């Protein structure tokens, strides 16, 4: 991979980065360590949801997930998610963010 970047909303907020900063430090370190493994193409537990939308799954906390896409060999972290109860809503929001990238509204 060439790199990893955070999806940025038009208002400048970065959902995944903001979520990481709000986590307990020990949990944040574990999640960031896992994200860094992606540089070596070690995705660990992940699932392809659609042709260009993936779910990085964690066994930490409430079963956290990070939805991401790959654009030009760069991982774009779109959205974090907590538990399964709102998973379909989270996936729809991640798809919206992905469509924004595709439409060059936000990259």
Where do the protein language model's features map onto the residues?
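Amphipathic alpha-helical recognition patches that constitute DNA-binding helices
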Residues: 15, 19, 55
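Enriched for short, Lys/Arg-rich terminal
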Residues: 1-9, 17-18, 26-29, 43, ...
């Amino acid at each position: 991979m060439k790199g990893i970047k955070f999806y940025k909303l038009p208002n400048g907020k970065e959902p995944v980065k903001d979520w990481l900063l709000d986590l307990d430090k020990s949990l944040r370190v574990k999640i960031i360590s896992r994200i860094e493994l992606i540089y070596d193409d070690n995705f660990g537990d992940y699932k392809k949801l659609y042709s260009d939308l993936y779910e990085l799954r964690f066994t930490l906390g409430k079963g956290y997930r990070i939805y991401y896409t790959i654009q030009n060999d760069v991982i774009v972290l779109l959205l974090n998610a907590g538990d399964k109860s709102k998973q379909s809503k989270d996936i729809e929001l991640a798809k919206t963010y992905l469509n924004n990238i595709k439409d060059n509204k936000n990259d």
